[in-house]
């Protein structure tokens, strides 16, 4: 299973790195994902959750 937030759906994004001369090369931006235990269908489960979802209170740890 890929690293993706189960709450917000955030995952790695790709784009270009640009030098001073505006040459481009591919790079990725990785989401700040934490593996936490939360209740899924009434049972505790370890899943990937973004730090943004944890800070905003969208999910509560068990």
Swiss-Prot record:
Region described as Disordered: 1-27
GO MF term set: structural constituent of ribosome
GO term, biological process aspect, one: translation
SUPFAM superfamilies per the UniProt record, alphabetical: L28p-like
Basic residues bias locations: 10-20
Keywords: Ribonucleoprotein, Ribosomal protein
GO cellular component: ribonucleoprotein complex; ribosome
InterPro entries, per database record: Bacterial_rp_bL28, Ribosomal_bL28, Ribosomal_bL28/bL31-like_sf, Ribosomal_bL28_bact-type, Ribosomal_bL28_sf
Domain of life: Bacteria
Family: Belongs to the bacterial ribosomal protein bL28 family.
Protein name, entry field: Large ribosomal subunit protein bL28
Organism the protein comes from: Listeria monocytogenes serovar 1/2a (strain ATCC BAA-679 / EGD-e)
């Amino acid at each position: 299973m890929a690293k993706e937030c189960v709450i917000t759906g955030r995952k790695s994004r790709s784009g270009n790195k640009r030098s001073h001369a505006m040459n481009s090369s591919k790079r990725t931006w990785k989401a700040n994902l934490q593996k936490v235990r939360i209740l899924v269908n009434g049972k505790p489960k370890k899943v990937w959750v973004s730090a943004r979802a944890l800070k905003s209170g969208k999910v509560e740890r068990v």
